[in-house]
């Protein structure tokens, strides 16, 4: 259709030009051929860009006594039902969770899931507009607030230029044909024909440049999302087109406290002291909190967001001594950060207890400090491990540690805290995306390559998942001088 419109317009324009100036047929043919070639070569398919989350949201939540994985299925730019999956793990209590999808000025939608045996439970809510939303997961005692985005259908400026250009060219084509047939003066027909070619040039140029134009900064990833900037992210580009924009943000400060079986974490902006409420989901969680007890037991928990900058998790500090911890977070504009803190045990009379038995076997080929070592963990004999937090395995490394009764106190000042991963291997023919915890086909061996920075004794823990149970295998590794 576009080629026909171009040919007709060119013939109309060229006929008028020939009548007025006496151009040769060869010149007319070359002129027509040039425009047809430009039209055929320079018109790729131009589609609208969807701004927002392009994938499902997977986030771990240590809610009450449960270790949950909440999956918010992608919705938008075409609005529809909001599908939510909740994975409960072995050891989690049965019960009912109330789910609420909320956004200021939007219709609130509610639902619930009834948890039973370990597995996946689903609910369907509704969202009625694009913008930033919160999914509230309430167990009756604590309400976890998970931020997510509903993307909008966004038309980029070059797509608008292309659409308007083609529309104007079509309208001017009709005017040009009518003027050619009815005008008594040849130059009058030349005006709409020339305008049509200009409009067509704008349209073809916009369509040609569309695949090569960079997307605008992403709301929710580069800067704080609002209803306005999700609907029109290009407005921010236009208003800041004079100079480059610095989206960086300062580090975060962490203050931790414990009491009444609850561990509280407050995050504040180091430049302003205000609550830091711009965390991104990083490796399947808003916060990865690693806690080492006085006896050397490691806990990997994911505090839930209860208010801006405030996070909580159920945690009993039953040992006397120091509970050392690090919080691994990713801040919008601030990158990945590792924050340290500690709390004291709440039972002065209680002494450190023995660590729980290992649920796997670890062997290591240890190289001198600074060189790559190989750590292998084996969990059972069957290849049925499940991905947890998007990974087959997690390895926590703390050290070097001196000898002493309070391991938590030594861990607090240890120079090395590391969190390594064993990635999910790509599946042949897979279309992409993160496999959920229903996929049980990995292992039983998990291998890590890690370089210990300093010589000394390290505590190492490897974690994975099988049959919806989180398994942990601890070991000590001695690293020699290079």
Model-derived features with residue positions:
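Alpha-helical transmembrane segments
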Residues: 171-184
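Hydrophobic, ordered structural segments
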Residues: 305-352
